[in-house]
């Protein structure tokens, strides 16, 4: 009876793996399309604005990421990746906010440190009125980042499923020598 349960579990795991592989291929196809679309839109923007107007010389001297990739442990030790906007988790300020010496005579305001809550949009590096194709390129690459994180999570789930499949096959081989 244990062999029948093991075979049923093996069958369900194989079906899950096949579904995950099909989903992985679909997401990879969409990712390739998004990246291709992004590069094509970037080429259109370079054509519209001029080759020298869209290039590395317009990049900011100090760049900050707009998104971060967070890895978290899900069920059964699987790692899941998630794309999170960079402004969501701001580091906390440590230390005194006020100056060391204060004048007691009058209420004077101490200047508050400037905090950039939202990171600057990189499209502003190329001017105020940028072509629509440059915005399309940014959106395509942003979608590609999300898809890449989903693909990495899915690939981890597939690897975990393959290791589970091998383990179940070994158990079945021990229960029924000559089968499997």
UniProtKB/Swiss-Prot annotation:
Q: Which domain of life is it from?
A: Eukaryota
Asked if the keyword Aminoacyl-tRNA synthetase belongs to this entry, the reply reads no
Q: What is its main location?
A: other
Instruction: Provide a GO CC annotation, any one.
Output: endosome
Please list the disulfide bridges.
none
Ranges of Basic and acidic residues composition bias in the record:
92-101
What tissue expression does the UniProt record report for this protein?
Expressed throughout the brain.
Localized where? Endosome; Lysosome; Endoplasmic reticulum-Golgi intermediate compartment; Cytoplasmic vesicle, COPI-coated vesicle
Q: Name one GO molecular function term.
A: unfolded protein binding
Coiled-coil annotated spans: 16-37, 153-176
Name the UniProt key words of this record, in alphabetical order: Coiled coil, Congenital disorder of glycosylation, Cytoplasmic vesicle, Disease variant, Endoplasmic reticulum, Endosome, Lysosome
Which GO BP terms apply? cellular response to increased oxygen levels; intracellular iron ion homeostasis; lysosomal lumen acidification; lysosomal protein catabolic process; vacuolar proton-transporting V-type ATPase complex assembly
State which disorder the record connects to this protein.
Congenital disorder of glycosylation 2O: A form of congenital disorder of glycosylation, a genetically heterogeneous group of autosomal recessive, multisystem disorders caused by a defect in glycoprotein biosynthesis and characterized by under-glycosylated serum glycoproteins. Congenital disorders of glycosylation result in a wide variety of clinical features, such as defects in the nervous system development, psychomotor retardation, dysmorphic features, hypotonia, coagulation disorders, and immunodeficiency.
Summarizing the function annotation, the protein's role is: Accessory component of the proton-transporting vacuolar (V)-ATPase protein pump involved in intracellular iron homeostasis. In aerobic conditions, required for intracellular iron homeostasis, thus triggering the activity of Fe(2+) prolyl hydroxylase (PHD) enzymes, and leading to HIF1A hydroxylation and subsequent proteasomal degradation. Necessary for endolysosomal acidification and lysosomal degradation. May be involved in Golgi homeostasis.
User: What's this protein's name?
Assistant: Vacuolar ATPase assembly protein VMA22
Provenance organism:
Homo sapiens (Human)
Q: Which gene encodes it?
A: VMA22
């Amino acid at each position: 009876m244990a062999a029948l349960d093991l075979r049923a579990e093996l069958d369900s795991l194989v079906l899950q793996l096949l579904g995950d592989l099909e989903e992985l291929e679909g997401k990879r196809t969409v990712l390739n399309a998004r990246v291709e679309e992004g590069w094509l839109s970037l080429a259109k923007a370079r054509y519209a604005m001029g080759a020298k107007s869209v290039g590395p010389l317009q990049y900011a001297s100090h760049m900050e990421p707009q998104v971060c990739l967070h890895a978290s442990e899900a069920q059964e030790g699987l790692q899941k990746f998630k794309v999170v906007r960079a402004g969501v988790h701001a580091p906390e300020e440590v230390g005194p906010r006020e100056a060391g010496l204060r004048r007691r005579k009058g209420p004077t305001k101490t200047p508050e440190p400037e905090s950039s809550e939202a990171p600057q949009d990189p499209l502003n590096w190329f001017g105020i009125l940028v072509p629509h194709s440059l915005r399309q390129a940014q959106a395509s690459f942003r979608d590609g980042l999300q898809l890449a994180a989903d693909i990495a999570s899915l690939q981890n789930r597939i690897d975990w499923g393959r290791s589970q499949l091998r383990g179940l096959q070994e158990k079945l081989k021990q229960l029924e020598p000559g089968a499997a």
